[in-house]
Amino acid sequence: KLTGLLTLALQYGIDNIPDAILGREKEPLKNMLRPKNSEAPKEIQAEVPKWLYDKAVVQYTDHKALFEAMQQSAPLDLRVNTLKATPDEVIEELTQHGVQAEKGQYSPECVRLNIKPALTQWPIYKEGKVDVQDEGSQLIARLVQPKRGEMVCDFCAGAGGKTLALGALMKSTGRIYAFDVNEKRLAGLTPRMRRAGLSNIHPAVIRNEHDLRVKRLYGKMDRVLVDAPCSGT
């Protein structure tokens, strides 16, 4: 059993595995995964590349706390689709399934989970009440301040996370052009917008900024979002 749990811990991170699965093996596993050789190079103990360790030591007084924080798993942020639910309703539904959730710190639509469940299999996801999106990306959409009935262009839409957020903020009114040069990434937007119940988004693959589809819209947009490179990275 311990070998199997160790494999899971190495693959997903021990903090992402529920205590109900780890049981009494949690502490032994943590000890196994914790560097023990104090004679090992400092960057090995910190589990970071040497170049990063050297820079951090110079730039940060409390670099040990930084390295410890880097070893922690990031929480999972959801954006609540306010066309179908409220953050309070989503938190209540998650709580009923035994998942601890809380509101985000900055985005009104953000709900943060302490674990990373198989969310895509849950009704709350399939029904389009939530979508996975980190709080920072949610704020990008809010900074655009889209209004109902406006013409908006998401110039580097990618898989459409911020496009969907814009669509919800506009209450599925107006028109959003979702452009990207990567056809494969943009293809993921269509099923997501259907699940979200949005009808104001129009995805299109373009060659570059001089594409005819873009030229036709010159001077017609109320707002344009250009998030390049993607803030999510």
What are these regions (language model features)?
Residues K1-T233:
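S-adenosylmethionine
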